[in-house]
Amino acid sequence: MSSTSTSSALIHHFRLTTRNLGSPTKQRCPYAVTFCNSWREAGLRYSVTQRRSKGFGPVSALNDDDSPTETTPGVGSAVEDRPPDSSEDRSSSVYEFLYPRKEELPDDKEMTIFDHLEELRERIFVSVLAVGAAILGCFAFSKDLIVFLEAPVKTQGVRFLQLAPGEFFFTTLKVSGYCGLLLGSPVILYEIIAFVLPGLTRAERRFLGPIVFGSSLLFYAGLAFSYWVLTPAALNFFVNYAEGVVESLWSIDQYFEFVLVLMFSTGLSFQVPVIQLLLGQVGVVSGDQMLSIWRYVVVGAVVAAAVVTPSTDPVTQMLLATPLLGLYLGGAWMVKLTGR
């Protein structure tokens, strides 16, 4: 190549017309050349000997025929390129969940990691504020709540005692905390949905509403079932078992520890159909597969009831295992009816 001594301040773009390839002939190679800071940044495909023999500074060469036609998404882009559909597994629901199509993605603006952290901080603050206000409101009516929660065994002649100074006060704080968390849970749920909603596809957004509504309904149904059925049955079993031998004088703190743990664990265990629907929509397991293992589910429901319930009596365990088994079978049929 012929060398031309020209000031770099006057030339911003020039084209190399010929390049000596080490043979008597010369080939014309249209390259767009721009000045760069280093050979590594330039990315020229010259050998070390060729680089040292050049008389000009570092340049970057780009073939006109190889020019990119579209911009590659940069770091922090919310859209991840789909891998090529080279196998049959790529058409599964799991693949569609991990790599959604671009037309399914929402048209929301992208945010930096710092913007996400700031939004998360604000939503956590709102959730904590709502739960704190609910706890204060429940503490103002804590005595009424305690009388309401004592109702399942009041007719059995059970007497509650304060066995240590301040035990009743700390019990009211515990009851207020549980009830405040229960009343503030809708706000927490809303903030979680508002935070993750921009990152969901349109299909996932349509699926989110029924899932949230069903989960909330099942949780409160579990609380009601525990208060009206499970707790009275368990406590009556203990009272009748001790009848004629010892008088039932219960610690107020231990009683509410038992009742509150039983109620909330029952509410959480009622989320089984929601988990099944999520697994079915993602494509991890089908409805037929869920129904085919019903024998193992029976054993698992009994074991789960024994772990979840704070008591060790068989009555409470069977009362909880029965609805768990029914919820599982109902969830499996729902997954099957949805075509999964």
From Swiss-Prot:
PROSITE patterns (UniProt xref): TATC (PS01218)
UniProt main location, coarse: plastid
Composition bias type Basic and acidic residues, residue spans: 79-91
Consequences of knocking out this gene: Seedling lethality when homozygous. When grown on agar medium, mutant seedlings have an albino phenotype and contain plastid lacking internal membrane structures.
GO biological process: double fertilization forming a zygote and endosperm; thylakoid membrane organization
UniProt keyword annotations, A-Z: Chloroplast, Membrane, Plastid, Protein transport, Thylakoid, Transit peptide, Translocation, Transmembrane, Transmembrane helix, Transport
GO MF annotation list: proton motive force dependent protein transmembrane transporter activity
Membrane disposition: Multi-pass membrane protein
Subcellular location: Plastid, Chloroplast thylakoid membrane
Membrane topology (Stromal): 61-127, 201-209, 279-289, 336-340
Transmembrane segments annotated in the record for this chain: 128-148, 180-200, 210-230, 258-278, 290-310, 315-335
Origin superkingdom: Eukaryota
Record topology, Lumenal segments: 149-179, 231-257, 311-314
Coiled coil: none
Presequence positions on this chain: 1-28, 29-60
NCBIfam families reported for this sequence: tatC
Family according to the record: Belongs to the TatC family.
UniProt function note: Part of the twin-arginine translocation (Tat) system that transports large folded proteins containing a characteristic twin-arginine motif in their signal peptide across the thylakoid membrane. Involved in delta pH-dependent protein transport required for chloroplast development, especially thylakoid membrane formation. TATC and TATB mediate precursor recognition, whereas TATA facilitates translocation.
Additional free-text comment from the UniProt record: According to PubMed:18930082, TATA is detectable only in minor amounts in Arabidopsis chloroplasts.
Protein name as annotated: Sec-independent protein translocase protein TATC, chloroplastic
